[in-house]
A protein has these predicted regions:
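Non-heme Fe(II)-dependent double-stranded beta-helix
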Residues: 2-152
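Non-heme Fe(II)/2-oxoglutarate
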Residues: 3-22, 27-33, 220-221, 225-297
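Short hydrophobic-aromatic micro-motifs
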Residues: 66-67, 163, 214-216
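Short, solvent-exposed loop/turn segments at secondary-structure junctions
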Residues: 71-73, 129-134, 148, 170-172, ...
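Active-site rim elements
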Residues: 99-100, 200-204, 224-226
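A structural signal for short, well-ordered beta-strand segments
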Residues: 126-128, 163-165, 238-242
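Catalytic core of non-heme Fe(II) oxygenases with the double-stranded beta-helix
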Residues: 138-207, 248-255
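Conserved metal-binding segment of the jelly-roll/cupin
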Residues: 208-223
């Protein structure tokens, strides 16, 4: 069991994953380093061949997009290994957000975010990481919408966007994402409020591998499936939510894409996620106890 004192000690986390940095410092490289990796610095190059016009057409029609082979494999492999180390240590995968590299993944996606949200981008304090293990009946989150309010104005002005990044292969066998495309739901008599409202033939599976980036309007109905015990590997993934900062804040505090939170701020934010998402994710009493202790100061 991890103590509150350990949780508050950045060196404890650096020791668990010495190849990753916290606020520019890692256990394997104690000197302060530049927190911007090559992936973040070369963000524009990641989308050099992306057809943003076709991407927009699909997004505004169906409510989501899926791009393959965008993010650098080396960065994703290090994050996947770090989450596997957290799991092996009996710690939740969401603790990966203590490390700089988890934030750098999304910083590298600025050109994509700018295309949909404009230049004024804010990170919402809503994020999670999954390790869907087929050995214990693991599953993604049940059907839901990330935000129940207005996610866009008309068909050309987006208010908020969710991004989802697989660190491993995400397949129908190990729990890939599923969506109800808006192009189908808009013909329903009323918006879907429960899974039974969905016409099964309208459901779309979205298998994806490391390097892919998936995004959807926050009012898109979506879920992660349950893994088969015959799946060969777990589904490991990250998500983070964003908004156009020109609109009223959809969360508090709004975060800066270019300046990740400090270690103490990250710890508080992560503890808040466990409280926020306890209705979506099974959590043990020990995890909730140290989260509540951190939130109380």
């Amino acid at each position: 069991m991890m103590t509150v004192e350990q949780a508050k000690n950045a060196d404890f986390w650096r020791g668990l994953n010495p190849g990753l940095q916290i606020c520019g410092v890692s256990a394997s490289s104690p000197q302060l380093a530049d927190a911007n990796t090559d992936a973040a610095n070369a963000a524009t190059d990641l989308f050099a061949t992306t057809d943003f016009s076709a991407l927009s057409d699909r997004f505004w029609d169906e409510g989501y997009f899926l791009l393959h082979d965008i993010l650098p494999a080396e960065l994703l492999a290090r994050l996947r290994a770090a989450i596997e180390q957290l799991i092996a240590s009996g710690l939740p995968p969401a603790m990966i957000y203590l490390y700089d590299e988890a934030w750098q993944v999304f910083s590298a996606l600025r050109p994509l975010l700018t295309h949909f949200l404009g230049e004024k981008i804010a990170l919402l304090p809503h994020f999670w990481a999954w390790h869907v293990d087929p050995r214990d009946g693991g599953r993604g989150w049940p059907p839901h919408r990330d935000y129940q309010g207005e996610s866009a104005i008309g068909d050309d002005m987006l208010i908020s966007l969710s991004l989802w990044v697989p660190l491993s292969d995400a397949t129908p066998e190990n729990g890939c994402m599923y969506v109800l495309p808006r192009s189908f739901e808009r013909w329903y008599d009323s918006p879907v409020t429960k899974p039974q409202d969905v016409v099964l033939q309208d459901v779309r599976a979205l298998p994806a591998g490391p390097g892919a980036v998936m995004g959807w309007r926050q009012d898109v109905y979506h879920w992660g499936s349950r893994a088969s015990r015959h799946a060969s590997s777990p589904r490991i993934s990250l998500s983070l939510e964003f908004q156009n900062a020109a609109f009223d804040p959809l969360g508090d505090p709004l975060l800066d894409l270019e300046t990740p939170p400090s270690f103490d701020e990250r710890l508080l934010l992560i503890a808040g996620q466990f409280e926020k998402y306890r209705h979506m994710q099974n959590m043990d009493d020990e995890t909730l106890a140290w989260c509540q202790a951190i939130l109380k100061g």
